[in-house]
């Protein structure tokens, strides 16, 4: 009996050693396989999850049937198709603006797309694709006394939390009383109810609201060409960022970007940097 046990032990040890070796080899082989199966570092390699907004017209907003549309949405769908993803493989989810970049950083979304301006501060926590649009920051108001920055002194000025407008206003409109909102719709509702005197937002969005509410006028326009909007990706996900850049520049070069800009921003000048090159 003791002899038999002595015989079994070496074979048991040998089997264990072989099993351990097989598992080690399998684990090592699994790493490159996983990378090959998910070259863009996506949360789910079969889809691209995109955080966006439902009220940032004409960039990103929801239609009456609950679908997302807008310049950013259509541009991203075109870019995604160029890197191999069909429309039904791109999953859009609406959020408040302030939550978009943290959600990408924390791997809730692969990308955020909502006319998000590129700044050095934001690049500390997330990465950006190359820029795809730039324009103006605007003050929307029904108050005829507001015609310049000085006219905002002592006024209640709405801003959407986390936006370039909030950053700019805190630095440059120090005499105004800033009131922070989760989105433009709630801020404009407050403006229409005279809870705030003015709202600071993107020019194209301001133009849309002023067309819907004729009493609201665009009183101030401030250039923001130094912070063009880009698609937000997780910090260090260079594979996805570079793929987006390649597809984005292809969309610019073949005129897709121009067509979408003309559709969503009729009459607005187009920066030459985004137009086809000879």
Language model segments and positions:
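Extracytoplasmic small-molecule ligand-binding "clamshell" domains
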Residues: 36-114
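Ligand-binding clefts/hinges and TM-proximal coupling segments of bilobed small-molecule sensing domains
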Residues: 37-38, 167-181, 217-220, 248-278
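Periplasmic-binding protein-like
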Residues: 54, 133-140, 203, 207-248, ...
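Extended ligand-binding regions for polar small-molecule ligands
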Residues: 73-83, 155-156, 161-164, 230-268
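Acidic, polar ligand-binding/catalytic clefts
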Residues: 77, 90-151, 217, 222-223
């Amino acid at each position: 009996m003791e002899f038999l046990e002595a015989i079994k032990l070496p074979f048991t040890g040998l089997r264990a050693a072989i099993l351990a070796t097989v598992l080690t080899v399998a684990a090592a082989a699994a790493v490159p396989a996983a990378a090959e199966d998910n070259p863009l570092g996506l949360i789910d390699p079969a889809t691209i999850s995109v955080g966006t907004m439902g009220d940032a017209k004409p960039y990103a907003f929801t239609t009456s049937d609950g679908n997302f549309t807008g310049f950013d949405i259509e541009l991203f769908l075109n870019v995604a198709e160029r890197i191999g993803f069909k429309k039904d493989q791109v999953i859009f989810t609406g959020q408040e603006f302030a939550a978009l970049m943290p959600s990408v950083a924390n791997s809730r979304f692969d990308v955020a797309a909502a006319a998000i301006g590129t700044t050095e501060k934001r690049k500390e926590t997330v990465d950006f694709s190359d820029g795809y649009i730039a324009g103006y920051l605007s003050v929307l108001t029904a108050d005829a006394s507001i015609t310049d920055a000085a006219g905002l002194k002592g006024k209640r000025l709405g801003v959407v939390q986390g936006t370039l407008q909030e950053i700019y206003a805190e630095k440059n409109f120090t005499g105004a009383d800033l009131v922070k909102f989760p989105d433009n719709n709630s801020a404009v509702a407050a403006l229409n109810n005279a809870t705030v005197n003015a709202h600071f937002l993107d020019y194209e969005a301001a133009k849309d609201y002023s067309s819907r509410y004729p009493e609201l006028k665009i009183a101030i326009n401030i250039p923001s060409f130094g912070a063009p909007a880009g698609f937000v990706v997780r910090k260090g996900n260079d594979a996805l960022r570079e793929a987006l850049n390649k597809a984005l520049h292809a969309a610019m070069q073949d005129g897709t970007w121009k067509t979408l800009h003309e559709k969503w921003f009729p009459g607005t000048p187009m920066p030459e940097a985004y137009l086809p090159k000879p």
